[in-house]
């Protein structure tokens, strides 16, 4: 008689079977946090800390602020995915999010959102200071309640006021270092506030059909390209002007000043190019996406310059 040995239930095979499943689940949870958004938010955090310190803060403070800020942004993103799961399935851009595909259940997403938010506040409170923790809580509240629940489905100005949540990282960073919120932090807050519309509206022009299908009144989806391009140009000019306030009111030096002028001029050129194209085309997709990607490059360059600035020469005014 021949003995048959089954290997389907051995611990090794069980481990192999569970491994990919665990990896998929972890990846799904990560996707809930909108990591690309977190990356963009963190671009502003460390440079602001360096500028506030006029040098490098302690490694412990940097880690606490970056991790706490990332967790706060991730919590807000996960709450957003939970609340918007009904419209995400209607949009090609978001139809593969974990709550739409079923990789994560609504209950799991909600618990994850709360845990991540609680961890963020605790890390900022004990790793930095209570002020930065309160600002982190304010950022989560603003994105989840003000933007996602109240504004997003009701007004074409949703991203203008709701986008203020994305400005909080500079306040958190400044508060973590100085335990206060001063004029340079407020100016940087306003730069990102004014940057948000010319960043997102070109994207909503490109994916206008998605937003219309989901009945989300994003300006780029419900207004014509001519109207949207005018708004993009106006906000771009206001943003560049605001960025230059760091020179008289924020103690900025030559590195920041030159970068703000040159990068600002380049982004204004791209914004005006979108406007010119919009006068001839109903949906200037390629030019709109060029402005979208250009806005990311602009903000990255500006904050890199902010980080380098304290190490290279005195302030332009009063130095």
From Swiss-Prot:
Q: Does the keyword Transferase apply?
A: yes
NCBIfam families annotated for this entry? Answer: cyoE_ctaB, PRK04375.1-2
Q: What is its EC number?
A: 2.5.1.141
Q: In which pathway does it act?
A: Porphyrin-containing compound metabolism; heme O biosynthesis; heme O from protoheme: step 1/1
Q: Keyword annotations for this protein?
A: Cell membrane, Heme biosynthesis, Membrane, Transferase, Transmembrane, Transmembrane helix
What is one process in the GO biological process aspect for this record? heme O biosynthetic process
Membrane spanning segments where?
A: 59-79, 108-128, 131-151, 158-178, 183-203, 232-252, 254-274, 299-319
Q: What is this protein called?
A: Protoheme IX farnesyltransferase
Topology class, membrane = Multi-pass membrane protein
Concerning Pfam families, the annotation shows: UbiA
Gene3D superfamilies hit by this protein? UbiA prenyltransferase (1.10.357.140)
From which organism does this entry originate? Answer: Pseudarthrobacter chlorophenolicus (strain ATCC 700700 / DSM 12829 / CIP 107037 / JCM 12360 / KCTC 9906 / NCIMB 13794 / A6)
Which taxonomic lineage does the organism of this UniProt entry have?
Bacteria, Bacillati, Actinomycetota, Actinomycetes, Micrococcales
Q: Which InterPro entries match?
A: Protohaem_IX_farnesylTrfase, UbiA_prenyltransferase, UbiA_prenylTrfase_CS, UbiA_sf
């Amino acid at each position: 008689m021949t003995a048959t040995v089954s290997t389907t239930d051995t611990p090794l095979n069980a481990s192999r079977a569970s491994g990919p499943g665990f990896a998929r689940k972890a990846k799904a949870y990560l996707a809930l946090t909108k990591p690309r958004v977190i990356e963009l938010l963190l671009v502003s955090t460390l440079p602001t800390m360096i500028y506030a310190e006029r040098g490098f803060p302690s490694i412990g403070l940097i880690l606490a602020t970056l991790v706490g800020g990332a967790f706060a942004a991730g919590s807000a993103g996960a709450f957003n995915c939970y609340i918007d799961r009904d419209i995400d399935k209607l949009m090609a851009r978001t139809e593969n999010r974990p709550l739409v595909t079923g990789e994560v259940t609504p209950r799991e997403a909600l618990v994850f959102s709360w845990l991540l938010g609680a961890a963020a506040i605790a890390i900022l409170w004990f790793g930095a200071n209570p002020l930065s923790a309160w600002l982190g809580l304010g950022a989560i509240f603003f994105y989840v309640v003000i933007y996602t629940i109240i504004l997003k489905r009701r007004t074409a100005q949703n991203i203008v006021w709701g986008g203020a949540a994305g400005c909080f990282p500079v306040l958190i960073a400044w508060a973590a270092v100085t335990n206060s919120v001063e004029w340079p932090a407020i100016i940087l807050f306003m730069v990102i506030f004014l940057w948000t519309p010319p960043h997102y509206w070109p994207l909503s022009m490109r994916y206008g059909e998605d937003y219309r299908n989901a009945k989300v009144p994003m300006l780029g989806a419900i207004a014509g390209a001519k109207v949207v391009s005018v708004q993009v140009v106006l906000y771009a000019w206001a943003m560049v002007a605001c960025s230059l306030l760091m020179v008289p009111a924020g103690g900025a030096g030559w590195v920041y000043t030159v970068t703000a002028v040159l990068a600002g001029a380049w982004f204004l050129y791209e914004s005006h190019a979108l406007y010119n194209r919009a006068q001839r085309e109903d949906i200037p997709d390629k030019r709109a996406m060029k402005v979208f990607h250009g806005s990311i490059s602009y903000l990255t360059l500006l904050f890199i310059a902010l980080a380098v600035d304290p190490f290279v020469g005195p302030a332009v005014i009063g130095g």
